[in-house]
């Protein structure tokens, strides 16, 4: 079958591309009930193909890349919950970065189709670096027509779930996979960190340093090995859906010029295969959300690496995480219903814009570049400085919190540093809490103020990192308030 994202995927193709299991179930607005009646808890699932026609731009590098093949299809996966009084939808999209207007367009269509208001829909990118460009970052620009198509497909995923509701039971919990997450920002021996693209030698840490280098000192922060789990099953015990959350940036051992959902899609397929015997042929959906992984990846820099064939690391990570989720699933205590609540708040944050000598230097570098493509990191970030100079002085940032029973979910539209996710969990009013990053928009990296002082790639001023230094503190404070709001 030729994968064509601009046509409707048939049911047979849908089964083939979603782990071999039909995926659809739903939610409706609560109906009027007689006194004393209790509406059954219901959950719905859907999986929609978002793979584009080729060739197409792939975001995720300093230079644009063109995809000419597809290793595995891209999807928008959806879970919808209904307790008879409130409804929530969670959508995970196989993409690197999705700008807010795309999500807003999708949510507008969702409300028109289903009645679900925007605050009751959490939609996020997974952060695969082999997805389609829908947000301008570095030298990649949005693929014409794909943003509108993607918004429609996200809405279709929710609408499909809304139209196939079935009774369900719900549970939540967590496990741990410590062996697949590593902090990628390292302290190095004095004098061994290269100058940054702005010509300064002030960075105190280096992202992705040489592996097993004698110049390594120690990682600049922790990791979060937690795998959080939201699970749904039917009253007869057959599994219906699992949403997992893991703080791992992406894996990325793909072939060149090939689209892939990365380990997020591999995880969905692996868990579906593990669940298949228990599912007994009934629909089941697995999906992975990205936690707080702005400074985390899958590389153990303390050891020399051994290169494997393409996709081998993705497969290994997916298998490790899926096996842990599968084992923990067996221990979950399911219940017949759960409180559902949501809250959204928009805050305004300042932009770190270049000016004066910094901007003059950037213009001189770009003018001297052989172009039109910028080839060196100095040229790339000079171009970013020029583009960032046209940004407003402040930007709105949407924040969201969900309550699902005694589980709290924070949603932030940034590549969030792991310290922030750990703090939100520790300070949450819920026993179980996790954060989904890159949700409802894209506002670049979110380092803590302490990490801003250390410098390094994630702090370098660009369209990928532009929020004010105090942004993390302000976002964390607002998220704590939102979690408290949905808890009450």
Predicted features and spans:
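N-terminal secretory signal peptides
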Residues: 1-9, 17-27
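Conserved beta-alpha junction segments in alpha/beta enzyme cores
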Residues: 37-124, 128-285, 289-316, 329, ...
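N-terminal signal peptide c-region/cleavage motif recognized by signal peptidases
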Residues: 29-31
């Amino acid at each position: 079958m030729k994968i064509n994202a601009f046509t409707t995927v048939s049911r047979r193709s849908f089964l083939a591309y979603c782990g071999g299991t039909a995926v659809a179930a739903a939610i409706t607005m609560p109906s009027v009930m007689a006194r004393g009646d209790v509406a059954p808890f219901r959950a719905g699932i859907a999986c929609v193909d978002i793979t584009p026609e080729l060739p197409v731009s792939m975001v995720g590098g300093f230079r644009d890349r063109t995809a000419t093949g597809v290793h595995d299809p891209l999807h928008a996966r959806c879970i919808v919950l209904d307790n008879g009084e409130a409804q929530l939808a969670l959508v995970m999209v196989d993409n690197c970065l999705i700008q807010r207007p795309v999500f807003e367009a999708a949510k507008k269509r969702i409300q028109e189709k289903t009645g679900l208001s925007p605050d009751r829909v959490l939609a996020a990118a997974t952060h695969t670096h082999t997805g389609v460009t829908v947000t301008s970052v570095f030298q990649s620009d949005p693929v014409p027509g794909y943003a509108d198509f993607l918004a429609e497909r996200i809405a279709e995923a929710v609408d499909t779930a809304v139209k196939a509701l079935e009774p369900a039971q719900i549970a939540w919990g967590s496990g741990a996979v410590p062996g697949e997450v590593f902090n990628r920002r390292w302290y190095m021996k004095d004098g061994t960190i290269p100058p940054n693209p702005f010509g300064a030698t002030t960075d105190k840490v280096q992202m992705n340093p040489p592996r097993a280098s004698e110049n390594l000192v120690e990682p600049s922060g922790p990791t979060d090995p937690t795998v959080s789990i939201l699970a749904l099953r039917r009253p007869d015990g057959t599994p219906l859906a699992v949403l997992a959350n893991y703080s791992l940036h992406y894996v990325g051992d793909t072939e060149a010029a090939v689209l892939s959902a990365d380990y997020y899609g591999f995880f969905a397929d692996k868990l579906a295969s593990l669940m298949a015997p228990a599912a007994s042929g009934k629909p089941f959906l697995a999906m992975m959300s990205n936690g707080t992984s702005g400074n985390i990846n899958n590389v153990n820099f303390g050891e020399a690496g051994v290169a494997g064939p393409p996709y081998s690391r993705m497969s290994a990570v997916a298998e490790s995480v899926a096996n842990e989720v599968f084992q923990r699933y067996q221990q979950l205590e399911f219940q017949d219903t759960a409180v559902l609540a949501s809250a959204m708040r928009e805050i305004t944050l300042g932009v770190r814009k270049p000016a004066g000598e910094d901007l003059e230097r950037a213009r001189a570098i770009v003018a001297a570049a052989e172009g039109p493509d910028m080839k060196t990191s100095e040229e790339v970030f000079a171009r970013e400085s020029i583009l960032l100079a046209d940004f407003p002085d402040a930007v709105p940032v949407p924040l969201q919190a969900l309550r699902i029973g005694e589980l709290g979910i924070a949603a932030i539209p940034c590549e969030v540093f792991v310290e922030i996710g750990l703090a939100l969990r520790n300070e949450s009013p819920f026993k179980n809490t996790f954060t989904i990053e890159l949700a409802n928009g894209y506002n670049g990296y979110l380092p803590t103020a302490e990490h801003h002082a250390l410098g390094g790639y994630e702090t370098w001023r660009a369209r990928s990192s532009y929020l004010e230094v105090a942004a993390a503190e302000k976002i964390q404070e607002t998220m704590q308030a939102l979690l408290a709001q949905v808890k009450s």
